[in-house]
Amino acid sequence: MFLIILMFFLQSYGHSVSQNVSRPNIVMVMSDAFDGRLSFDPGSKVVQLPYINYLRELGSTFLNAYTNSPICCPSRAAMWSGRFVHLTESWNNYKCLDANATTWMDELERNGYNTKMMGKMDYTSGSHSVSNRVEAWTRDVQFLLRQEGRPVSQLVGNMSTKRIMKEDWKNTDKATKWIHQMAARSQQPFALYLGLNLPHPYKTQSLGPTAGGSTFRTSPYWLTKVSSELVSIPKWLPMAAMHPVDYYSTFTKNCSGDFSEEEVRRIRVFYYAMCAEADAMLGQIISALRETGLLNNTVVMFTADHGELAMEHRQFYKMSMFEGSSHVPLLIMGPRLMSGLQVNQIVSLVDLYPTLLEIAGISAIGNLSGHSLLPLISKSSNISKKQHPNWVLSEYHGSNANASTYMFRIGQWKYIAYADGLSVPPQLFDLTLDKDELHNVILRFPEVQAHLDKLLRSIVDYPKVSTNVHLYNKKAFSAWRCSLGGNYSQVIANLRWHVDWQKDALAHEKAVDKWLSGSLETFYDYNKC
């Protein structure tokens, strides 16, 4: 089936309307929680993704692309601003960019592009649930509470049911219509961004309006796209052998209980089916470009804000530096770009800002964290062949992890430092020998750890950043608590952690008070309003 689709599009791609390619159109489709390892072999064999495969055949696939923060808003803040999370202070899903922050889309519009943004944006401050922000603020409190619903799978509809995520399909239809409108207008280049919610798990409705997303939902139609026999059951470390931050994540994500092998397999199969539905939305956008004769003069990019663990490491969701969570897809196709290229260079989402500006012929501003990827994928000899850094930085400061986390990826190594670098032990994985990341070799390679930690500190003073996040959490929580007045005890007891909180509400409130009293700023009393 894929070969038929590819031949059809190859013919169309070669016979699109001839247009000036000096300033090509730009289309970015950004999904949510898409495991980047599915965009190339062997992961791509598990589920049929014909349109991602199409981009792989006619464009460039980045085999080592990473999020700069494995959670929605901070990751998108990095992508839209081109700057690392600690520079924009995008600490959690509630604290990200200011509403007036300059994005690469602003730069394109300022330089003559007709721009449109549709679907999930999620890069500015102020969004997400109260539970989500309070869980992030209180991650240093000495209690352990389940914050998410237990991950489950849900089958809906029948073999004719193709549109499960209706909001995404609605936005995809709008984007398709907009492309047709652009084709009928002037030759002014355009830039289109389409943000998808899929394959992010759905809210578990039975847990109430504040519930997080723990339901993997699909239909029989999309299940046929998954080769179930190729779906692996991930190995888990015993809970007692887990790193303390991973233990905290597993518990707060409600994954510490028993799971049958069939449960785990079903969650993973359903997740892959959700990826297939997202791929179909990408396909509709590509089809619209082909039908309008615009495909030959359009750079098409597919990526995601982060991945999905799908029960690897006894976790679902993201908020982790393990590959399932931090590795994102990145495929780029367009005029004067290489075809069928697989790029081993380690890259990250902050690289997209300078890449898109260079594609549009716009000089990049000087304070970006990222570097253009165009030298790696362009056919043109006029493109500067500046060497891309051989490392990436990802960091995490939000909920479901009880320490600020810093991932430094270089060569075969993934080094993960925490907090101040001393209070929480670091981790080191050799991804060449240990693709499942089950063997922390930090004690075997002290020289490697020392070298990588020195490199990491040359990029970010992570102990200082961790202190800043710690102080922000206390100030933000204290302000929120004061805003509630006499309703505080009732409100905090009924957040997503209510089942565990209400087992001993008084003890949990005292733990919060103790945390606030242990201030790093002795002149500030966080317990007073």
Name each region found by the language model.
Residues M1-M7:
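Classical eukaryotic N-terminal signal peptides for Sec-dependent ER targeting/secretion
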Residues M7-N20:
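N-terminal signal peptide
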Residues N20-P24, A33-V46, R146-M165, H180-Q188, ...:
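Active-site-proximal cap/lid insertion segments
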Residues S39-S75, G82-R83, E109-K116, E229-I233, ...:
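Short, structured active-site-proximal loop/turn typified by the sulfatase FGly-forming signature C/S-X-P-X-R
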Residues D41-G43, G59-S81, C96-L97, M117-H128, ...:
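Short, solvent-exposed turn/loop segments enriched in Gly/Ser/Thr/Pro and often Arg
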Residues A78-K174, W178-A184, Q205, A211-R217:
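Catalytic-site neighborhoods of secreted/periplasmic enzymes
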Residues Y123, P209-T210, E323-S325, S394-L443, ...:
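C-terminal, low-complexity/hydrophilic appendages and adjacent surface loops
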Residues T172, H306-E312, V350-Y353, E358-L431, ...:
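C-terminal cap/loop subdomain of S1 sulfatases and analogous C-terminal strand-loop tails that border
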